């Protein structure tokens, strides 16, 4: 749609019964959208001058006068046009400042000459030289002026909100009128077609009548011919008088024939007259019908023209509504900028006051005045920064401001400045508190504190607990306050934990498990633990004696021989006991995670701790299946389509991360640490990998699997699982003990090529066999209705595919992932996921405990500086590399930092790689022990690193509203996702359900508070207008499969449906309707399915009341389902006449459901096609 010009200023709209004033940016007003209201007031007309079109195409500057008025009660039709005023070339240009308190007369009476230049920057303002010099001399606004700016921006936001709501309502009304006109046009054309059908029938009857007339004429001619023949025959008989008797008989016969011919002639004449009369009537009727057709044609054409004009009006008002919402978003940004500027000024002022108080006891009065000058300069700097961030609205040079600026210019601050600053600080506190209270009133149940949501997040994978929708948060507490509060609540457990920790340190220092310690390399690590423990304090020495006392107590018990079976059982009991004790304990610690509990339990009962577990090797072999079941579960929650949409990050970001990180670490290891080339290659590739099990578990616990950084992290981890195969193949080839004599390019190429072929054959076979066999096999087993056999078949599929990939040289986890990916496409995925949940949880916990068993705390104490330095370099270096690589792939800085923190720790495959390197003679056992320790500690730090990433995001990402705007690069990997328009209570529940099933979605809302809450929970929620084509394009609407629309107002819902159906018709839209009439209009606008919001809440309340009335649960469910089915059937029947499908957008094979039996629900008696949107 072309616009004549974008006027870069604000205009005043004045209308309504109460003459309320509305501020609107003049870029919303174009020569094509020109206002002409009632009573001579001009409003928009869809026609536009061709000269103005060419002007906008050539991007020429057009000047307009500044006065426009809008009647708030216009009836939805636009007429007339706004002619551009004669351009006035004036050397000056400035921004016209429009406040909600201004009037139209003020704007009209403004006799200044304005010139507005159209350009890329909407906020570019030019001043004359005098004004520019004056502005440079003026100092920044004071705190009071900043508060005034904030108040003005808040008022402007309120006006913009009312304005956008008004335009959305008008857009809805105009659209409804357009729909009615369209229906009238369609009805008129139907009447025309029906009349034409009647005319055609009349024409057919006319042709039949003409044929009858022709037949009657022919019959009359035949009768006359017979009469003539009879007369001639009679005359001929009269001349022949041979026999009188014969003549008499012949004459008699001839007379009879003559009479018969006369009768036929008479009958034919009557028939002919009747046919001619009928033909005349049909011709008259045809003429009348033709006139009726002409009249209906004219009426239909008029209705069609009116409908087309109405559609143009709808397009125009939709553009105006979109621009009104855009202005509201800009006003929100200005309010946010004003708040930030005010907070900066207050922070600077409070800091300066504290500094003055501290220095006041030493400095004299002169120094105090100098300190005040420094404070003033800081405030001026902050004010200049705020001025650059703000679009200054209504800054007028009043007397107070001028006096303040003159004081600053002369460098003579008053002696009472400190007192005034203190008063201003107190006022600013009250303003901020009042502002926070207003925001909390706007969102009473939705904007609960971030701290509360984060605490509940640790308890469950559901990121929206029930308290989120009912609690009123008192504000976001700091991290320190949350730690103190948690410590007060959990102080007995903390004391117990520190006691156990001290006992463990004492045990390690006392040399428990000395026989299991690996030999140390003198030139790399320090083998003496005495240097560490010689300086211990008396309390620690007393704690070191605890293990000996515990051993003495144990020796007092009678000793019995333990056979192999009992030893295995005891190992299982110790593992379960340790997990039961440590996991709940670490979950209570702030920032704790079950992973940390498992790791701590493994350290304590492992070979480097109390040495309780005897068969460590067998335990590790079993624990590997924990990772197998985890990857199988991840595959169940994904799909082939979603995986294909992530190929950019899997093969792009993943390969870049592995190659770059391995190269950097390998070079540092070779040139800085002096390791050999093969060892540097193994160390670089081993440390480049991350822990799939730990990271995915942490993401699921925190509910971040579907977030931006969660998707990117999973993609990199998936590629790392493939890269492990290459590393394990490479280690024997570069070994000095290899039969081929070390590194050989040909040998490596041959091995990798053979491995690639085997992997491709194995993966292809698994995918092909799974698609052909899994569904029939599971159907056959499900028909037996045996849960044990069903679970056994699931275990067979998991272990079988894992074995196949292991035999092909791939990891077992990759095979399980493929099996889960194939089962996700069947209808048995939910049952399969439920069956494997117990195995997955226990085996995954066992895996984390085996990782803890690999950590040697005594070796850590002996080589603490070396290990901590290596650990710090690993975490910081990998994070920096991932941030750089992620930025190149379009990931934002904050998301890239969070991905880097999650991928920075080492992985479980490093244990395998380093162990194999020791066996091949590439690295020494001492070095591998140190690397085991570094990798194990880094894995233990993963939950805290994830929490640190969230803290960074909450501190930096949510400061500015602009950071909440959608960016196309952040959603370009989404395919077939869901768009949630409106992140209120309904949108949040939908987001929770989708996130729990790992279904990708993107949410939009115009409330920055709601968006900030969603972003703090790592959800893909963006600040934007759901009815804007540009915003919808940025969130990938052209690739989305459906949209759930639950905005606050009916007008906003209607505008969003209209935009999606017009610009993105492939997206199925499911909308919340306020009532049936609203739902019908939404369906006419293009909604796929409409859900009346009154039905389901009524049914829920009715169910609660019936339960209170002591009705059985089964009877309540039957009654509710019966009513729902009957209501939807009646609603569908009522909508059949209008051609809509209101009633959740699905059809039934039966018009009315059968009454359900006691043993059956109503859902068993009807076949439903489609998805029930409730």
Swiss-Prot record:
One of its GO terms (molecular function) is potassium ion transmembrane transporter activity. It comes from the Eukaryota. SUPFAM superfamilies: NAD(P)-binding Rossmann-fold domains (SSF51735). Disruption phenotype: No visible phenotype. Disrupted K(+)/H(+) efflux antiporter in the kea1 kea2 double mutant. Double mutants kea1 kea2 display strong growth retardation along with pale green leaves associated with a delayed formation of chloroplast pigments and electron transport complexes, as well as maturation defects of the plastid ribosomal RNAs and hampered RNA-protein interactions. The double mutant kea1 kea2 exhibits a drastic photosystem II (PSII) quantum yield recovery under moderate salt stress. Impaired rapid hyperosmotic-induced Ca(2+) responses in kea1 kea2. Acetylated at Lys-170 by the stromal acetyltransferase enzyme NSI. Keywords: Abscisic acid signaling pathway, Acetylation, Antiport, Chloroplast, Coiled coil, Ion transport, Membrane, Plastid, Plastid inner membrane, Potassium, Potassium transport, Transit peptide, Transmembrane, Transmembrane helix, Transport. Residues 975-1092 form the RCK N-terminal domain. Detected in leaves, stems and flowers. Expressed in shoots and roots. Mainly localized to leaf veins, hypocotyls, mesophylls and guard cells. Accumulates at high levels in small and dividing plastids (at protein level). The modification N6-acetyllysine is found at residue 170. Gene3D superfamilies: 1.20.1530.20, NAD(P)-binding Rossmann-like Domain. Residues 58-565, 614-620, 670-678, 735-746, 829-841, 887-898, 950-1174 are stromal. The chain crosses the membrane at residues 566-586, 593-613, 621-641, 649-669, 679-699, 714-734, 747-767, 808-828, 842-862, 866-886, 899-919, 929-949. GO terms for cellular component: chloroplast inner membrane. Residues 1-57 form a transit peptide. NCBIfam families: 2a37. The full-length protein being inactive in a heterologous system, the N-terminal region (58-556) seems to have a regulatory or auto-inhibitory function. Belongs to the monovalent cation:proton antiporter 2 (CPA2) transporter (TC 2.A.37) family. KEA (TC 2.A.37.1) subfamily. This is K(+) efflux antiporter 2, chloroplastic. The gene is KEA2.
């Amino acid at each position: 749609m072309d616009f004549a010009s974008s006027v870069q200023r604000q205009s005043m709209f004045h209308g309504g019964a109460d003459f309320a004033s509305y501020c609107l940016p003049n870029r919303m007003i174009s020569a094509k959208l020109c206002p002409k209201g009632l009573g001579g007031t001009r409003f928009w007309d869809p026609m536009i001058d061709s000269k103005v079109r060419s002007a906008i195409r050539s991007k020429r500057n057009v000047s307009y006068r500044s006065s426009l008025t809008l009647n708030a009660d216009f009836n939805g039709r636009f007429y007339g046009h706004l002619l551009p005023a004669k351009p006035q070339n004036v050397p000056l240009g400035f921004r016209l400042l429009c406040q909600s308190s201004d009037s139209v007369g003020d704007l009209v009476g403004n006799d200044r000459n304005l010139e507005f230049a159209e350009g890329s920057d909407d906020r570019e303002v030019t001043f004359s030289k005098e004004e520019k010099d004056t502005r440079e001399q003026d100092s920044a606004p004071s705190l009071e002026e900043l508060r005034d700016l904030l108040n003005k921006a808040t008022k402007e936001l309120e006006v913009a909100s009312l304005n956008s709501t008004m335009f959305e309502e008008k857009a809805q009304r105009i659209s409804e009128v357009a729909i009615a006109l369209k229906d009238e046009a369609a009805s008129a054309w139907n009447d025309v077609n029906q009349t034409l059908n009647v005319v055609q029938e009349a024409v057919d009857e006319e042709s039949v009548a003409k044929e009858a007339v022709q037949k009657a004429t022919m019959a009359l001619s035949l009768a006359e011919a017979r009469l003539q023949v009879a007369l001639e025959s009679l005359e001929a008989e009269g001349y022949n008088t041979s026999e009188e008797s014969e003549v008499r008989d012949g004459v008699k016969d001839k007379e009879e024939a003559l009479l018969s011919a006369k009768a036929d002639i008479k009958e034919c004449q009557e028939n002919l007259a009747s046919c001619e009369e009928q033909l005349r009537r049909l011709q008259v009727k045809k003429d009348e019908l033709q006139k009726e057709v002409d009249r209906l044609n004219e009426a239909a054409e008029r209705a069609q023209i009116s409908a087309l004009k109405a559609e143009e009006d709808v397009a125009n008002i939709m553009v105006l509504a979109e621009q009104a919402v855009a202005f509201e978003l800009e006003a929100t940004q200005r309010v946010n900028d004003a708040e930030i500027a005010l907070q900066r000024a207050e922070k600077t002022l409070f800091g300066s006051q504290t500094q003055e108080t501290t220095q006041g006891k030493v400095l004299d009065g002169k120094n105090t005045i100098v300190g005040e000058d420094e404070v003033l300069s800081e405030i001026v700097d902050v004010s200049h920064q705020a001025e650059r961030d703000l679009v200054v609205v209504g800054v007028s040079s009043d007397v107070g401001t001028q006096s303040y600026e003159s004081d600053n210019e002369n460098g003579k601050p008053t002696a009472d400045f400190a007192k005034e600053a203190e008063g201003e600080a107190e006022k600013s506190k009250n303003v901020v508190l009042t502002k926070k209270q207003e925001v909390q009133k706007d969102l009473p149940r939705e904007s609960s504190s971030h701290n509360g949501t984060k605490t509940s997040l640790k308890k469950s994978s559901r990121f929206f607990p029930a308290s989120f929708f009912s609690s009123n948060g008192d504000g976001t507490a700091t991290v320190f306050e949350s730690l103190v509060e948690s410590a007060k609540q959990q102080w007995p457990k903390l004391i117990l934990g520190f006691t156990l920790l001290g006992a463990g340190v004492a045990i390690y220092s006392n040399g428990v498990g000395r026989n299991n310690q690996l030999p140390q390399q003198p030139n790399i690590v320090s083998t003496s633990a005495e240097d560490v423990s010689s300086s211990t304090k008396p309390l620690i020495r007393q704690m070191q004696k605890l293990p000996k006392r515990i051993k003495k107590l144990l020796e007092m018990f009678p000793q019995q021989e333990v056979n192999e079976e009992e030893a295995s059982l005891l190992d299982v009991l110790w593992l379960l006991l340790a997990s039961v004790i440590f996991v709940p304990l670490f979950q209570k610690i702030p920032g704790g995670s079950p992973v940390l509990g498992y790791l701590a339990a493994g350290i304590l009962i492992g070979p480097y701790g109390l040495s309780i577990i005897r068969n460590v090797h067998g335990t590790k072999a079993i624990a590997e299946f924990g990772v197998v079941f985890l990857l199988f579960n991840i595959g169940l929650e994904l799909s082939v389509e979603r995986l294909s949409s992530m190929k950019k990050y899997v093969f792009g970001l993943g390969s870049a991360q592995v190659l770059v990180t391995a190269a950097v670490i390998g070079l540092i290891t070779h040139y800085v640490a002096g390791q050999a080339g093969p060892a540097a290659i193994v160390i670089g590739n081993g440390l480049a990998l991350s822990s799939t099990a730990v990271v995915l578990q942490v993401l699921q616990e925190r509910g971040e699997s579907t977030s931006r950084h969660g998707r990117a992290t999973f993609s990199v981890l998936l590629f790392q699982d493939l890269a492990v195969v290459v590393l394990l193949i490479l280690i024997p080839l570069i070994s000095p003990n290899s039969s081929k004599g070390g590194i050989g390019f040909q040998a490596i190429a041959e091995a990798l090529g053979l491995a690639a072929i085997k992997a491709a054959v194995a993966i292809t076979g698994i995918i092909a066999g799974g698609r052909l066999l899994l569904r029939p096999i599971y159907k056959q087993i499900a028909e037996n209705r045996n849960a044990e056999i069903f679970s056994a078949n699931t275990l067979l599929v998991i272990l079988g595919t894992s074995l196949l990939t292991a035999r092909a040289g791939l990891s077992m986890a990759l095979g399980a992932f493929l099996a889960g990916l194939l089962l996700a496409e069947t209808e048995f995925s939910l049952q399969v996921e439920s069956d494997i949940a117990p195995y997955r949880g226990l085996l995954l916990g066992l895996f984390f405990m085996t990782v803890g068993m690999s950590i040697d705390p005594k070796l850590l104490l002996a080589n603490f500086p070396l290990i901590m330095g290596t650990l710090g370099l690993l975490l910081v270096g990998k994070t920096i590399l991932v941030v750089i690589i992620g930025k190149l792939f379009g990931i934002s800085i904050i998301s890239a930092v969070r991905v880097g923190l999650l991928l920075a720790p080492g992985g479980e495959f490093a244990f395998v790689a380093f162990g194999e390197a020791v066996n091949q003679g590439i690295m020494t056992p001492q070095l591998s022990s140190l690397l085991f320790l570094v990798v194990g500690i880094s894995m233990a730090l993963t939950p805290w690193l994830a929490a640190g990433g969230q803290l960074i995001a909450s501190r930096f990402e949510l400061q500015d509203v602009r950071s909440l705007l959608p960016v196309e690069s952040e959603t370009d990997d989404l395919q077939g996702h869901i768009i949630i328009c409106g992140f209120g209570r309904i949108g949040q529940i939908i987001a929770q359900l989708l996130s729990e099933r790992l279904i990708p979605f993107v949410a939009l809302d115009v409330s920055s508070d709601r968006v900030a809450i969603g972003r703090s929970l790592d959800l893909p929620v963006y600040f934007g207008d759901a009815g804007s084509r540009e915003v919808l394009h940025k969130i990938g609407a052209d690739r989305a499969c459906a949209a759930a629309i639950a905005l606050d107002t009916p007008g906003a819902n209607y505008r969003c449906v209209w935009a999606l159906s017009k610009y993105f018709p492939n997206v199925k839209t499911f909308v919340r309707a306020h009532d049936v009439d609203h739902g019908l209009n939404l369906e006419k606008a293009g909604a796929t399915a409409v859900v009346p919001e009154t039905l389901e809440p009524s049914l829920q309340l009715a169910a609660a009341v019936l339960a209170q009335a002591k009705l059985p649960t089964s009877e309540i469910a039957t009654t509710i389902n019966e009513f729902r089915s009957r209501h939807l059937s009646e609603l569908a029947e009522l909508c059949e006449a209008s051609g809509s499908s209101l009633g959740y957008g699905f059809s039934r094979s039966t018009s009315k459901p059968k009454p359900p039996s006691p043993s059956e629900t109503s859902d068993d008696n009807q076949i439903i096609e489609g998805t029930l949107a409730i």
